[in-house]
């Protein structure tokens, strides 16, 4: 086992395995794995303890008015289906007014629903309908930039100083000594104002100004974080939160949460988010926030209830290590049937974040999202996807599903890059597949008028077909979500102890514990039979298989498991 992982495993007093042949994974445990059943619940809304989130991309979920674009009324009409999955919360991508150069993340009015989605009253009614079904709803909050068409930015372009002049990061001149080191992040010659503005993603998304952690005295345009104009911007962004919380949403997913304060090591940005947390706790107690930061230990210290673990090294080892799935590096995903992946590298990175964040908040490992290729790609089958769901729904923290993954919607290739959907993002934002009618039931318009093309393959999955099949992926996902929602050992904060994880080997096994309630989860994505064994530090009751397929043998405190190719097994191994 790699040395860095040994440090992580030893820190939970578990074990080191002796490596053996690739196809014979039975190993000789050295010491007992320490499972205590103790766990500390972070400060978080109580409903998050069992939460399973379902991400809906509004423009491609359901078109209720026949214009080819999904809308809020369409989501309302499909809430009974969402509820039937067993999920407890919904995350909605941006529905604000926008020119849609970046699919709505380029906002022109934070206080108004874009007409293509409906009205503010539709949003308020959607929130109420979600609550009526016993679910919660969070919305995307985009604090780091706006569209160049936003009235604030247009006002900041005026050469005459005004309220908005410093709400965006502008230099004092278009040409100045030392400008070369800034040019890569700034846009020149856009308007009559003499200066360059910083962009925070695409060029047309100017960065809102939260100040500089360490302003350069030679560059007076680098304002400190407590500058009066910056404080005014921060208060306005709090007003945006107030507006939507008053409308009925339960919280926010914070886009690019770590990219606010410039020249920052993260500490100043964290300080800002702590002030936001204090304001929310005072005025809107129980508000849930999840960051797009990808450094959970930093994000939860900043007051977030959770943070996504998906952008950086470690996550790719699970589902998208290959270059065909990402543009960063090459390798083998652990959750592929070829069975060439390595779970230890994921654990090395994940455990480093987990141990430093678990007492303060949660890690959210997403199945996918609007920026990631769908998990069903490059030959993965429904059987492969079921193993992924078993893993994701039994890990600690808050699971986030992406719409359509529950039926195995595929990543589509070679689609036009509309609204900024570059880097493979076009293929993961296609319309939801409801039935076998034209456009898979998403819309009644002719196909050429669709916002995005739908999967027209003969074997394209759909909800209605899978509803009829008790063995379908959809129904298996429902069973796993039900398990997640009812087992005390699967609460978000329940103990997590890896018990079988060897470099380049399968399966991966771990225990979730809450008091004397213990579950052993074993996943085998590889297309071969595998087995493994380990020793427990406690005397357990007779193991019982409660989900999946596999065999288990208990000899005193030693447990041995065996799994078929591409399978998972969940056993109850409660303490006596």
Residue ranges, per PLM feature:
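Bacterial N-terminal signal peptides
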Residues: 8-16
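Active-site and adjacent substrate-binding regions of carbohydrate-active enzymes
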Residues: 21-576
């Amino acid at each position: 086992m790699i040395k860095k992982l040994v440090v992580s495993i030893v820190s939970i007093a578990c074990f080191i395995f002796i490596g053996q042949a690739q196809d014979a994974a039975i190993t000789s445990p050295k010491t007992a794995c320490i499972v205590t059943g103790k766990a500390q619940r972070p400060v978080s809304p109580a409903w998050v303890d069992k939460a399973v989130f379902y991400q809906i991309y509004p423009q491609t979920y359901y078109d209720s008015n026949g214009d080819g674009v999904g809308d809020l009324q369409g989501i309302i009409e499909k809430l009974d289906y969402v509820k039937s999955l067993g999920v407890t919360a919904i995350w909605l991508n941006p529905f604000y007014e926008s020119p849609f150069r970046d699919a709505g993340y380029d906002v022109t009015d934070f206080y108004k629903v874009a007409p293509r989605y409906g009205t503010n009253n539709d949003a308020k009614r959607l929130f109420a309908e979600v609550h009526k079904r016993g679910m919660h709803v969070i919305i995307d909050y985009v604090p780091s930039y706006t569209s160049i068409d936003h009235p604030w930015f247009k006002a900041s372009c005026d050469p005459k100083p005004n309220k908005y002049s410093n709400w965006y990061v502008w230099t004092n001149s278009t040409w100045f000594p030392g400008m070369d080191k800034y040019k890569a992040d700034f846009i020149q010659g856009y308007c009559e104002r003499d200066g360059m503005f910083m962009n925070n993603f695409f060029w047309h998304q100017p960065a809102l100004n939260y100040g500089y952690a360490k302003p350069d005295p030679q560059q007076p345009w680098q304002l400190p974080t407590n500058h009066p104009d910056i404080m005014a911007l921060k208060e306005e962004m709090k007003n945006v939160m107030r507006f939507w919380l008053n409308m009925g949403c339960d919280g926010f997913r914070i886009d690019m949460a770590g990219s606010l304060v410039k020249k920052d090591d993260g500490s100043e940005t964290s300080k800002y988010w702590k002030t936001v947390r204090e304001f929310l706790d005072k005025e809107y107690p129980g508000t849930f926030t999840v960051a797009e930061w990808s450094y959970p230990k930093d994000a939860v210290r900043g007051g977030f209830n959770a943070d996504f673990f998906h952008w950086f090294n470690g996550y790719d080892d699970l589902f998208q290590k290959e270059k065909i799935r990402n543009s960063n590096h090459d390798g083998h995903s652990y959750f592929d049937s070829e069975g060439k992946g390595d779970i230890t590298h994921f654990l090395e990175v994940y455990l480093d974040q987990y141990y430093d964040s678990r007492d303060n908040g949660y890690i959210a490992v997403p199945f996918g999202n609007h920026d990631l290729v769908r998990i069903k790609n490059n030959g993965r089958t429904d059987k492969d996807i079921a193993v992924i769901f078993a893993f994701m729904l039994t890990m600690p923290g808050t699971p986030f599903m992406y719409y359509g993954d529950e039926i195995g919607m595929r990543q589509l290739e070679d689609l036009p890059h509309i609204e900024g959907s570059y880097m493979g993002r076009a293929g993961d934002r296609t319309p939801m597949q409801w039935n076998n009618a034209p456009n898979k039931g998403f819309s009644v318009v002719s196909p050429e008028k669709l916002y995005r093309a739908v999967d027209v393959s003969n074997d394209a999955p759909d909800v209605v077909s899978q509803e009829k099949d008790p063995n379908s992926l959809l129904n298996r996902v429902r069973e796993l979500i039900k398990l997640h929602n009812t087992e005390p050992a699967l609460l978000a904060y329940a103990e997590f102890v890896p018990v079988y994880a060897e470099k380049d080997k399968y399966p991966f096994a771990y225990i979730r514990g809450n008091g004397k309630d213990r579950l052993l989860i074993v996943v085998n994505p590889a297309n071969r039979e595998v087995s493994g064994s380990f020793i427990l530090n406690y005397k357990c009751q007779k193991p019982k298989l409660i989900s999946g397929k596999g065999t288990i043998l208990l000899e005193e405190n030693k447990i041995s498991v065996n799994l078929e190719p591409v399978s998972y097994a969940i056993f109850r191994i409660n303490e006596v």
